[in-house]
Regions:
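Amphipathic alpha-helical and helix-coil boundary elements used as assembly
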Residues: 1-678
């Protein structure tokens, strides 16, 4: 005769089908932040049950009147058959358990963890009445959150662990509800249960028969550090510690990167981590036979010899075990005996923590790490060829992202690595929409991608023909928008044909603040299609060791503010087609060492050592006539030169900031605000 505490009336209810299953035995484990699994051994008079037809059906395991566990049949096995009964095994799991079989790779942007988890649950056909959030505070928005090569279940568990969220299940015959919480208020409370030291006597009511408490060493302080490129000199460090540190050496949990971009978030994450350590410092373990114990519920314990243990305990883990041998009416090659004497009824084992310790889930589901690099395609708004922000960051679409639409919303802004980067100096080339780029991940974190280079492929070919011109190096751009034009710097290293080639599609501006020196070893050729303007603010010196050959297709205008001096070693020969007009404000002196001849119209005047010879048909001296008139000089002035484009020098770090950065000391947050001159 069994006492009421040990009487068993286990039953399995599957409302969708008719069956004659009797429960022979069941075991199961419930844990906070874990899907439960209940394994049942059943017997039936039918030996022809279709196993596949029962998969995914909801079922209710009744353990006590009105109490039990609800789940879906996720595995069904037919076993041995006797003369009349056949044995079956099945597993009950929550809807959440199905998420273990769905793996995804995708990106969530500008959503809170609550919104992300809700989205995943809805996608898995878990209706909104089957889960709820019981939060004491709003969860902040995550600008960028990647699910990378992890199951939906792993993803949800990881997010809960990162945010310090817990979840448990509430059961009824109609279904089970998944409950998320961030503090102790979301845990329901069971009726109190008495403690009865195991003595071999059978209790009249369910009791806790064994109860032990273990205290373990845990860190008493947490420190986190991170880096934010938008405030590079601000030391992002935060921490949390016990208000009254125990009399022991300081046990610090320090980690980098801490996963935050501002100190407020850092303090929050540090506090969650400290609570995680402390929630597992004291851990109670017990055994009993009360069938309504559930993980995620408070258990009020009474009757223990240690009065301070008679308190609320949070059940974090419950192991269920039930046997009902009376379901067997004949032997099916089974032995219902047990070494520990448990052959019939219900019993459990449980793990609990003090109610005062805020329970945080252990970090058992790490964020996936991406080893190495990946390729992606730069994206942007429709019709835009270059899409970037003030930091030169661009957006990409990864090849594994099935949900992105190749627009400006595909990813977060990705920083672009450069061979050199300073304060307004260095090198920069913005990857353009459609380019394939190489993406790496800081610390292997899928949420921190950055671009390290660009890649050619069969449609985007190099700007030089390869391998025919494998000795060439080139930096070639494309005019935007519309293309067609380009700028290029090309270097040819083929022996005997070395060349540096520069092409400017429109303007080429040079600004040299001091000297320019140019040496051409052979010939220099220069072609200007329009006007050529040159302005020298000081002297112009030019030496030609050979001939100077100059041809003017039109006029030559020369305006000299001072004197012009011309020295010719041998002859000055000028052939003028129409007129030479020399005019002077005061005098003109023409001097020749041996001979001076003026010749016109068959007449001439000749001056030489022998005298002055005047020859002409008629020679008139003071006999009328008039002088000829010249055209007169009217030289045009040159046009003004246009200034070259101008840039500005970069800046060094402020000495105080540089010193603090090197020493790892905190900086003034105000000085780090964008636009600060400090």
């Amino acid at each position: 005769m069994f006492s009421p505490a040990n009487e068993a009336h286990f039953a399995l209810h599957i409302d969708a089908v008719e069956h004659d299953f009797s429960v022979l035995e069941f075991t199961g484990v419930e844990r906070l932040n874990q899907p439960y699994a209940i394994e049942l051994t059943l017997v039936s008079e039918r030996a022809d049950i279709d196993s596949a037809s029962l998969l995914h059906l909801p079922a209710w395991l009744e353990i006590s009147p009105g109490g039990g566990l609800h789940g879906f049949i996720t595995r069904f096995t037919q076993g041995e058959s006797g003369r009349r009964l056949t044995r079956y095994q099945l597993r009950l799991s929550p809807q959440l358990g199905y998420l273990e079989y769905r793996t995804n790779q995708r990106i969530f942007q500008h959503q809170s963890v609550e919104q992300i988890i809700s989205c995943v649950l809805r996608e898995n056909a878990i209706h909104s009445d089957a889960w709820r959030f019981s939060l004491s505070a709003d969860l902040g928005e995550r600008r960028y959150c990647t699910q990378y090569d992890e199951t939906d279940l792993h993803f949800i568990q990881r997010l809960c662990e990162e945010e310090g969220l817990h979840f448990h299940f509430e059961h009824s015959r109609q279904g089970h509800v998944l409950v998320f919480g961030d503090d102790q208020t979301s845990f329901p409370q069971l009726e109190s249960i008495g403690f009865s030291q195991g003595s071999g006597m059978v209790a009249d009511q369910p009791v806790v028969k064994r109860f032990s408490l273990t205290a373990a060493t845990r860190p008493d302080r947490v420190s986190r550090r991170d880096y934010n490129f938008e405030t590079p000199h601000l030391l992002l460090e935060a921490g949390a510690r016990l208000e009254s540190a125990p009399a022991q050496p300081a046990l610090e949990d320090y980690d980098y990167p801490g996963g935050f971009s501002d100190r407020g978030r850092g303090r929050q994450l540090s506090q969650i981590q400290l609570e995680r350590h402390r929630s597992h410092q004291l851990e109670a373990r017990g055994e009993g036979d009360r069938p309504d114990l559930r993980s995620g519920h408070f258990l009020p314990l009474t009757g223990h010899l240690r009065d301070d243990w008679n308190d609320l305990w949070l059940l974090t883990e419950v192991h269920h075990h039930g046997k009902q041998p009376q379901a067997l009416e004949e032997s099916i090659s089974s032995d219902t005996s047990a070494v520990d004497g448990f052959v019939q009824g219900y019993r459990n084992r449980f793990v609990a923590t003090p109610w005062q310790a805020i329970w945080r889930p252990p970090l058992e589901h790490p964020k996936p790490r991406i080893a190495g690099s990946q390729s992606a395609v730069v994206t942007g708004p429709a019709g835009e060829e270059i899409h970037c922000d003030q930091h030169g960051r661009v957006k990409v679409q990864f090849h594994w992202d099935r949900e992105a639409q190749a627009d400006e919303h595909t990813s977060c802004w990705l920083r672009v690595a450069s061979g050199w980067a300073g304060d307004r100096y260095g090198a920069i080339a913005i990857p353009r929409v459609g380019m394939e780029v190489l993406v790496s991940f800081l610390e292997g974190d899928p949420d921190q991608p950055l671009i390290t280079g660009c890649l050619y492929h069969v449609e985007h070919v190099p700007p030089i023909e390869l391998p025919a011109h494998k000795t060439r190096s080139s930096f070639k751009t494309l005019s935007s928008p519309g293309g067609e034009g380009y700028n290029e710097l090309r270097i040819e290293d083929r022996k005997g044909a070395e060349q540096v080639y520069i092409h400017a599609q429109r303007d080429w501006d040079q600004r040299i603040e001091h000297d320019q020196r140019l040496h051409v070893g052979n010939e220099r050729h220069e072609h200007t299609a329009a006007n050529h303007y040159s302005e020298h603010l000081a002297e112009l010196h030019r030496t030609v060791h050979g001939d100077r050959l100059t041809e003017l297709k039109s006029s030559d205008h020369l305006s000299i503010a001072g004197n012009q001096h011309c020295r010719i070693g041998q002859s000055l020969l000028a052939d003028v087609g129409r007129e030479i007009h020399l005019a002077s404000g005061r005098k003109i002196v023409i001097e020749a060492g041996m001979e001076l001849t003026i010749k016109a119209g068959g007449s001439f005047i000749k001056l030489d050592p022998s005298g002055v010879t005047i020859s002409g048909p008629t020679v008139r001296i003071n006999s009328g006539g008039k002088p000829g008139q010249g055209t007169g000089a009217s030289p045009r002035l040159p046009g003004d030169t246009a200034p070259a484009d101008r840039s500005q020098a970069g800046s060094l770090l402020v000495p105080a900031q540089r010193q603090a950065l090197m020493l790892g000391k905190p900086l003034c947050a105000i000085c780090e605000e964008p636009g600060s001159d400090a």
